[in-house]
């Protein structure tokens, strides 16, 4: 391979964080010659903020990434040191798998997978500029002058895009603590005509765990039987740890109030808006000042690392104030500060500039993923990265993009929210954002998405075999339980209380009753004892939701019909009589591709949607007439 060929790729991914790793892996698995551009190889997979993966809503995203043969679930399973299933007492649809992770193990596991991935080359260096051929991306210029040619670029800059760190009155440029920001790319993005904004996130101080009084604290243990994220993980073998729990005190709050003027958040130094659901400790005291304390989880950052992450006291107060605060918190009175907490501002692009493929509307072949799109969180970034990387590979190959619908995946919900509604603050995933969350459960992510991964060519043979084995077992168990039935009278003999209506019910039907599980049915049909534990749980959950799923299917069908009703690219919104000028302007700016997308434009009423549909039908009629006219002229 000559030097020109060595610098030519199908897809270039800029950034080696959670979005970048998923993007690079997905593009490479799709068959694209892929380059992952990052400042240093040893920063690939670094967990910039909290040492944890998953949680409520976020755990669903990790399972979906895994179902599409992504990396995050497998890496988290290797590095997880405190697995907990959140919302365990609630229904399966809203349970959230989560684990604290050993930072070093996570980073090393991610680097190993990236290194072993075929079609993927890691290029160390800083991305200085984007190269275009007209309105199409054609390459990337590195800080050292090298030019990498490509057919598509995925930009995953995280907090590095014009990153600015705040610690009290101190401010300095950085992508994260100790690393340079990306300064030139924002100018290039502005020159393309993108709308840029500023967002902010924060992180708490890091503490020396050897100086914490653990004996005085309540402790939280991991689940006795850790539940892996990935289908590819048989069992969790990493040792599990405890974390400590403490609280702020009224004295803590007094110190914070007395120093609010020194906080970057409240002194006017920060322009960007922070995440509502991950507030700084200053925000907590200002907005919830009536509380006598706020909970703090003391999370060890690794099995052989004494660093502790105090989850709950993110701050941009000066370092001396942070030290004073620690002295007022039980168990932390003598804690040594290893790194101060800080806030970081960074540029992002209005995600309404994107198509649902995560390709920008203005520049063909340029894809964005992660915090540059206004999201917060490793899981949100990773999910976007996978979709962007896959579609970048398909763009480079001349194939149609993969679009995930709201009815199919939490990833589809997130992307649709971003591209149709935009963000006014960092976006994070919650189960409440999904209309069809009963069908979009963490436990059925493989069933929903693995066939798609196989269809588009990003599924490994090993995962395909595992998936088919799991599905075959579930299908057989479903068939067996549906073939076994019992009368209400006979069920009463086994202490199962059913309506005495004379209707026979199958074992599968009985599993939908809240007080009936497979253990109780084995007393009636001993052959059911042969169903393995994993299949048993999947079957019980499926049967439990079967009735609700039938009802939800009609709602899903309506939305799918609307998604299929395309808006022609040449439709003149100004020509729609009866539509307000404000809506015409919004539609021209947003360029929705389907009726479903148009419905989610701010201000769209049912009447406005009806006018739009009528105009589409008129447009279709004119197009048909024009085609017939041309055909007639050709025949003449």
Swiss-Prot record:
UniProt name for this protein: tRNA uridine 5-carboxymethylaminomethyl modification enzyme MnmG
Subunit field text: Homodimer. Heterotetramer of two MnmE and two MnmG subunits.
InterPro entries on file: FAD/NAD-bd_sf, GIDA_C_N, MnmG, MnmG-rel, MnmG-rel_CS, MnmG_C, MnmG_C_subdom, MnmG_C_subdom_sf
GO molecular function: flavin adenine dinucleotide binding
One GO term describing the cellular component: cytosol
PANTHER family, per database record: GLUCOSE INHIBITED DIVISION PROTEIN A, PROTEIN MTO1 HOMOLOG, MITOCHONDRIAL
GO annotation (BP), single: tRNA methylation
Database matches in NCBIfam families: mnmG_gidA
Disulfide bonds: none
Coiled coil: none
Function of the molecule: NAD-binding protein involved in the addition of a carboxymethylaminomethyl (cmnm) group at the wobble position (U34) of certain tRNAs, forming tRNA-cmnm(5)s(2)U34.
Name of encoding gene: mnmG
Source taxon at top rank: Bacteria
Similarity field: Belongs to the MnmG family.
Entry-linked Pfam families: GIDA, GIDA_C_1st, SAM_GIDA_C
């Amino acid at each position: 391979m000559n030097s020109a060929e060595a610098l030519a790729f199908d897809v270039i991914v800029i950034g080696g964080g959670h979005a970048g790793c998923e993007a690079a892996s997905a593009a490479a698995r799709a068959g694209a010659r892929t380059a992952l551009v990052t400042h240093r190889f040893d920063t690939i997979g670094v967990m910039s903020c909290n040492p944890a993966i998953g949680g409520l809503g976020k755990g669903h995203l990790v399972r979906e990434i895994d179902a599409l043969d992504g990396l995050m679930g497998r890496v988290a399973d290797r590095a997880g040191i405190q697995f907990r299933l959140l919302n365990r007492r609630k229904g399966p649809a809203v349970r959230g798998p989560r684990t604290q992770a050993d930072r070093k193990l996570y980073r090393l596991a991610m680097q190993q997978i990236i290194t072993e991935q075929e079609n993927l080359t890691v290029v160390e260096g800083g991305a200085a500029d984007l190269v275009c051929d007209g309105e199409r991306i054609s390459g990337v210029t590195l800080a050292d002058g090298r030019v990498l040619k490509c057919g598509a670029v995925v930009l995953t800059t995280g907090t590095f895009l014009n990153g600015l760190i705040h610690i009290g009155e101190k401010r300095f440029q950085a992508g994260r603590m100790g690393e340079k920001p990306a300064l030139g790319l924002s100018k290039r993005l502005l020159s393309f005509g993108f709308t840029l904004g500023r967002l902010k996130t924060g992180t708490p101080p890091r503490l020396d765990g050897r100086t914490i009084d653990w004996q005085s604290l309540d402790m939280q243990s991991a689940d006795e039987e850790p539940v892996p994220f990935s289908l590819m993980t048989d069992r969790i073998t990493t040792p599990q740890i405890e974390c400590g729990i403490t609280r702020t005190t009224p004295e803590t709050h007094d110190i914070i109030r007395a120093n609010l003027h020194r906080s970057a958040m409240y002194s006017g130094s920060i322009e960007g808006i922070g995440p509502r659901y991950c507030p700084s400790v200053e925000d907590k005291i200002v907005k919830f000042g009536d509380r006598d304390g706020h909970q703090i989880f003391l999370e060890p950052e690794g099995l052989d690392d004494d660093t502790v992450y105090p989850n709950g006291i993110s701050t941009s107060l000066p370092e001396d104030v942070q030290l004073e605060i620690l002295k007022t918190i039980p168990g932390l009175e003598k804690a040594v500060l290893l790194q101060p907490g800080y806030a970081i501002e960074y540029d992002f692009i209005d995600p309404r500039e994107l198509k649902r493929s995560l390709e920008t509307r203005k520049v063909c072949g340029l894809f964005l993923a992660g915090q540059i799109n206004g999201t917060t969180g490793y899981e949100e970034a990773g999910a976007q990265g996978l979709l962007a990387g896959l579609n970048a590979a398909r763009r480079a190959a001349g194939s149609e993009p993969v679009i995930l619908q709201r009815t199919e995946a939490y990833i589809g919900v997130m992307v649709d929210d971003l591209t149709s509604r935009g963000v006014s603050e960092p976006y994070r995933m919650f189960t409440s954002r999904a209309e069809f969350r009963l069908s979009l459960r963490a436990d059925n992510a493989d069933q929903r998405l693995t066939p798609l991964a196989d269809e588009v060519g990003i599924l490994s043979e090993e995962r395909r075999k595992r998936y088919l084995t799991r599905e075959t077992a579930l299908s057989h168990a479903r068939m067996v339980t549906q073939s076994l039935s019992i009368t209400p009278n006979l069920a009463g003999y086994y202490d199962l209380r059913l309506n005495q209506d004379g209707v026979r019910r199958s074992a599968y039907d009985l599993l939908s009753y809240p007080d009936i599980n497979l253990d109780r049915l084995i007393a009636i049909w001993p052959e059911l004892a042969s169903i393995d534990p994993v299949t048993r749980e999947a079957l019980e959950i499926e049967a439990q939701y079967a009735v609700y799923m039938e009802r939800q299917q009609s709602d899903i069908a309506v939305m799918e019909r609307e998604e299929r009703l395309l808006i022609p690219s040449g439709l003149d919104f100004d020509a729609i009589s009866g539509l307000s000028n404000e809506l015409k302007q919004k539609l021209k700016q947003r360029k929705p591709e389907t009726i479903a997308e148009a419905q989610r434009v701010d201000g769209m009423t049912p009447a406005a949607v009806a006018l739009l549909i009528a105009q589409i039908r008129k447009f279709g009629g004119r197009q048909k007439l024009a085609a017939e006219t041309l055909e007639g002229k050709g025949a003449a």
